[in-house]
Every structure is written in structure tokens, then in C-alpha cells.
């Protein structure tokens, strides 16, 4: 139950993380949302975040800036990914990575452990932006002229 939102436009990357968080909240309405910044979080903070608390059996853990994570945090997330794939009571984890080469080893390690990757489109050209907007309208069964 680990997802990595990878690369692309920063606004769309944030939007996808918000969408996944809302989907997880709809599936587990009693869950807490715990946000960690991988820049200063360590493996102990991650272990505490995914563990049950007095108020909720599970938490929805959002790990921002995965590209800044240290090796130990990456190893713990990968190990959790391997364990949580068969656990119905596992806490969903949503990792946000800006893309690029920084933190690529940790990204690859977590993907290899079984995480689901969601690549965000990079909208640098005007045609790509227009096509993306049109797809968003179509997805919501709306029309724009």
C-alpha cells in the first residue's frame, strides 16, 4: 500500500498527492493523516507514523520530498512496502518525489519492493497543457468549447 507520485509539474504532483490522500480517507474514514518531510524525518518517525495509535488503527502517511530522504529512511520505507502488500490493516503510504536523479536509488528501491508509481506529466509545451486540460474535462464528463 505504498504509492510514489513521481516528477512532472509541481502543481500537478501536489494535486495527485492530495487526490490519493482523499481516496485513502474515503476508504479509511477513521484514519489519521500524518505528514512527514523526508528532508528531516528519520526511520523512527516513519515507524511511529505507520504504527497504530490510541485514536486510530491506521494512519495515512504522506512522505514529502522523498528525493531528500537518507538511505536508512529509504530502506525502512522499502521494507514496509514489502510487508504491507499482504496486510489488510497496513497504513497507506504516499511518497512524493520531485523527479530527476536526486534520490533515484531510493525511488528505485521502493519501486522494486512493490510500490505503485504514478508518473505526473511534465507540461512544458503549450500543446501539452491544452491536451492535459481537455483530458481533465473529459475525465469529469464535462465539455469545454
Where are the language model's segments positioned?
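Non-catalytic interfacial helical region
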Residues: 2-145
Amino acid at each position: 500500500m505504498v504509492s510514489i507520485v513521481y516528477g512532472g509539474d509541481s502543481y500537478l504532483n501536489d494535486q495527485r498527492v492530495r487526490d490519493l490522500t482523499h481516496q485513502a480517507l474515503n476508504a479509511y474514514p477513521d484514519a489519521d493523516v500524518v505528514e512527514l518531510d523526508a528532508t528531516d524525518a528519520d526511520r523512527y518517525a516513519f515507524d511511529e507514523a505507520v504504527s497504530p495509535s490510541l485514536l486510530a488503527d491506521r494512519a495515512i502517511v504522506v512522505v514529502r520530498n522523498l528525493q531528500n530522504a537518507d538511505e536508512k529512511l529509504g530502506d525502512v520505507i522499502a521494507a514496509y512496502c514489502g510487508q504491507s502488500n499482504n496486510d489488510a490493516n497496513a497504513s497507506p503510504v504516499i511518497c512524493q518525489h520531485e523527479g530527476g536523479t536526486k534520490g533515484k536509488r531510493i525511488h528505485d528501491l521502493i519501486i522494486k519492493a512493490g510500490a505503485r508509481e504514478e508518473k505526473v506529466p511534465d507540461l512544458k509545451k503549450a500543446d501539452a497543457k491544452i491536451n492535459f486540460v481537455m483530458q481533465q474535462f473529459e475525465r469529469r464528463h464535462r465539455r469545454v468549447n
